[in-house]
Structure formats: C-alpha cells, structure tokens
A protein has these predicted regions:
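ATP-binding/phosphotransfer module of carbohydrate and carboxylate kinases, centering on a glycine-rich
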Residues: 21, 36-191
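Residues that mark the start of a beta-strand
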Residues: 1-2, 166
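Short phosphate-engaging motifs
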Residues: 11-12, 177
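Short glycine-rich anion-binding loops that position phosphate/pyrophosphate groups of nucleotides
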Residues: 8-10, 137-138
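Short glycine-aspartate micro-motif
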Residues: 2-6, 12-14, 43-45
C-alpha cells in the first residue's frame, strides 16, 4: 500500500493498493486535507472548521508567514515577497529560512508537524509501506520539511506502526498530475 500526500494550496491525497488507485463510490477519496484537526479552528474552504488544510497547506503557511513579515518578524521574506499571499511561494519561504528568518522556519516547522499528524492518521488507518510526500514545499525544502513531517508522523502514529513505513519525496515533479490523470483515465477505460 502506498499513500501519497500533496500539500499545496490545499492538501490532496491518494492511495494505491495492490497496483490499483482507491477511489470512492461517487468521487475521489483520501481527502486528507479535510481531516478535522481542530474543531474550533479556522474556517476551511469546504465549510468545516479546523481541517488539516487550515493548518498545514502552503496557503496556511503563506498566511502565517505574511503575518510574520507584516509584524517585522521576517525581514528577508518581507523584502523578497512582501505580504501578498500570491507572492509567498514555497521557494520564497525556503529562501527566507536560508537568509535567517527564524519566524518563517517556525511557521513551516509548525505546519510540517501538523501534516505529520495527518500522515499518522493515514498510517493508522491504511498501514502503508510507503508514504510519498510531494509538492512545492517538499521540492523547495526537501530535507528540513520532509524530516519534520516524518518525525511528527512517527511520534503520532500507533507504536506498532512507527517502524513499518518509509516517508519519501515524490519524484515526478510537475508531471505528477498529468501522469496521475492519465493513469486514472486508463483505469476508468478498463471498467
């Protein structure tokens, strides 16, 4: 079993079991970004409160980073990207961390740890052999970000599972969506 989790504007997910993509009856499944993590948390785009996306998506990270920049806590990010969320991309976050914006490092670390909790839920439910994490955050900060996600996942999943899975970086980059869509279309054509 392989679980894929892709934090970006939202947080998408997928699961492949015995070579088959698991899909729901009426639509996709593995909407991991909408796991309820904080019942009294921020309003999510889905209409619920406290979903994982409100805590760990790149959009949530960018919003917290913009606040830090506005408050003067992230001068490098402020100079490079300002406080406009559309300018605060994964690469700008990585550059700000490299330049010494510790507030941005804390924001990203906090979000990565929340994503790790989501990974732990997936591990507890699916017992995957591999968890693939992809997207711009992983590409911009592969070691730091992935290490935080993995450490958090292992600390929050059930102890029997802690050493049973690998966390790896997605390798398809910008081609992942195209390849995934083609595979899904091929599978749909077989039915």
């Amino acid at each position: 079993c392989v679980v894929g989790i892709f934090p970006g504007t939202g947080i998408g997910g997928a699961c492949v079991y015995e070579g088959q993509l698991i899909i729901g009856k009426n639509s996709s499944c593995m909407e991991i970004g909408h796991l309820p993590m904080m019942p009294q948390g921020q309003l999510c785009g889905c209409g619920q409160r406290g979903c994982l996306e409100t805590l760990a998506s790149r959009l949530a990270i960018s919003a917290a980073a913009a606040t830090a920049a506005y408050r003067g806590e992230a001068p490098h990010l402020l100079e490079a990207a300002g406080t406009d969320l559309s300018n605060i991309r994964s690469s700008a976050l990585a550059d700000a961390i490299k330049a010494g914006d510790t507030a941005i490092e804390q924001v990203v670390r906090h979000a990565a740890r929340w994503l790790g909790r989501g990974v732990a839920v997936a591990v507890n439910l699916m017992a995957p052999d591999v968890v693939v994490i992809g997207g711009g955050l992983v590409e911009a900060m592969p070691g730091f970000y992935l290490d935080e996600v993995e450490e958090s996942a292992r600390s929050y999943c059930m102890s029997p599972y802690r050493k049973t899975f690998k966390v790896v970086k997605a390798e398809l980059g910008d081609n992942a969506v195209t390849i995934g869509a083609a595979a899904l279309a091929r599978e749909a054509g077989k039915k």
